[in-house]
Amino acid sequence: MNLTLPIELKAKLDKELGNEVEYLVPLSDLSYWKIGGLAQCVVSPNSLKSLQKALKITSEFSELPRLIIGDCSNLLFDDEGYNGILIKLGNGLNELRFENDEVYCEAGVWVPELAFHCFRRGLAGIEHICGIPGRIGGLVFMNGGSQRRGILENVVSVDVITEKGEMKNIEASNIEHSYRVSPFQGKPLVIAAVRLKLERSTRAIVRKRMHEILASRRKKFPRKLPNCGSVFLSNPKMYDVIGPPGFAIEKVGLKGKRRGNAQISELHANFIVNLGGAKSVDV
């Protein structure tokens, strides 16, 4: 793939964001699945102000695809790459601030780190996220969590940025959500930060819950081979009828099934692992 971005766009990005911009980036280096071709452009903002700039600049070139990403722990990239702009929210947006029983997190805060800091303060309520690799912005976007819970159960408010780079605050009363569904999906809004409500507890109690969750994940989930976690959504209605997706997949004899160098994990059938050199078409 050759660089095909409009000259005017590249000039603006280089001038306004400098070393926060990379070109022709191997997506296999970003994805937990270790799969993907080249991305035309990856912008990694080091502040909310830079994020606003990036969104404003790229919105002027609406003909180009644009995607907001985090740690890419839940994404499958095409072998052909991404012929557009990726805006990657990570360590540059990692402000974490505790205020009594609430915590303010910028979108790039790493989820396990947030859980750890809550434990250190004896704050409970979000232990279920402790083993999820990813950024809090992505977790809020998909109302992610574990043990059939979602992070938006604890939301106080969410700061979002519009396509034009304007910051807005949305209170919990205006955030309808359900299992793995949030109002941010399918809307031209970028999650910039979130404020969460926690509960006073003790470090011992929080530690015990986290250890139980992590021990369960280590026992059940494949960790040695590249993967992107659970592939199929556990639909609450179907769960009552056929059980979790992994059980259903195993029941029809697909556990261990291989295509190319991608395989339905022999440890947990709701995981697809990269045995080495797998392609997106294999997955």
Question: Could you tell me what each predicted segment is?
Answer:
Residues N2-I136:
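Anion-binding (especially nucleotide phosphate/pyrophosphate-binding) glycine-rich loop
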Residues T4, E8, S28, N46-K49, ...:
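Conserved active-site and cofactor/substrate-binding residues in soluble primary-metabolism enzymes
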Residues V21, L27, W33, L93-L96, ...:
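Short clusters of hydrophobic/aromatic residues that line enzyme substrate/ligand-binding pockets
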Residues Y23, I161-T162, M167-V283:
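Phosphate/pyrophosphate- and phosphate-bearing ligand-binding catalytic cores of soluble enzymes
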Residues Y32-Q40, E80-Y82, I87, G137, ...:
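Short capping/connector residues at structural and topological boundaries
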Residues G36, V43-L48, L76-N94, F141-A172, ...:
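Structural signature of FAD isoalloxazine-binding scaffolds in flavoprotein oxidoreductases
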Residues F98-E102, E106, V111-P112, A124-G131, ...:
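Contiguous, small/hydrophobic- and glycine-enriched helical/loop subdomains that border
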Residues F119-R121, G125-V156, N227, L233:
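A gly/ser-rich beta-alpha-beta helix-loop segment of oxidoreductase catalytic cores
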